Amino acid sequence: MGKRILVQRRGRGGSQFRSPSWKRDGPVRYPPLGVISGKGYVVDILHEPGLNAPVAKIVTENGVEFFNYAAEGLYVGQVVEIGKGASPKTGNIMILGEIPEGTMIFNVEKRAGDGGKFARAGGTYAVVIGQKPEENKTIIRLPSGRTVEVDSRGRATVGIVAGGGRIEKPFLKAGKKYHRARAKAWKYPTVRGKAMSPYAHPHGGGSHQKGGTPVPKTAPPGQKVGFIGSRCTGRGCVRARAQQKQ
């Protein structure tokens, strides 16, 4: 008798597939608009399991407490300026429309009050490249190189997210990778369906492993696994598409 395959178990949402929310200190986002302004104090810099950058715990003058990604060079006890009139110094949270061109920023709000959407990974930053005051828009260049327009009334933090160079250090051991995946609720290791027995996966079985064929889009539920209706897959596919564009 067959058994439920991994993607079906993941879809059910068992505890081993859920992110361990009890390990989190809190959401890393700005408070709603109008709640914070003036000055805040960095009371602690925390290691957050599941995130790839240190998190700064900030308390404002009126007692509001929130979490933001720590900038490179930020330290406990530092005073950060928040909101209108803040100066473009590392760690300060500024209004996008007041940030000078060429400034490096992170945790950028796409819409005013959404808490921050862009440039949040360790070592990343966006750059302000222009302002459109008449349209309330700020033009920024994202870490990917793409240029976007965001609401000038939104907020961003000046500087670069701490934790850069993280991906340059190799894992060396499978156990290290296991613990990283466990912190993020990733399933590790991943096993190919072709390597399984026939009771465990529709692609399993056979005396020898052979290259499979894509599952057609007209296949019934339960047979639709892996790459469905794909023309090509893998690194060669990406290379071929790039050559076609040229």
Curated annotation (Swiss-Prot):
Report whether Cell division shows up as a keyword of the record: no
Which residues are in coiled coils? Answer: none
What domain of life does the UniProt record list for this protein's source?
Archaea
List the residue ranges of the region (Disordered): 197-227
**Subunit and partners:** Part of the 50S ribosomal subunit. Forms a bridge to the 30S subunit in the 70S ribosome.
Cited function? One of the primary rRNA binding proteins. Required for association of the 30S and 50S subunits to form the 70S ribosome, for tRNA binding and peptide bond formation. It has been suggested to have peptidyltransferase activity; this is somewhat controversial. Makes several contacts with the 16S rRNA in the 70S ribosome.
| Name of the protein described by the UniProt record | Large ribosomal subunit protein uL2
Q: Which organism is the protein's source? A: Pyrobaculum aerophilum (strain ATCC 51768 / DSM 7523 / JCM 9630 / CIP 104966 / NBRC 100827 / IM2)
Question: What lineage, starting at the top, does this entry show?
Answer: Archaea, Thermoproteota, Thermoprotei, Thermoproteales, Thermoproteaceae
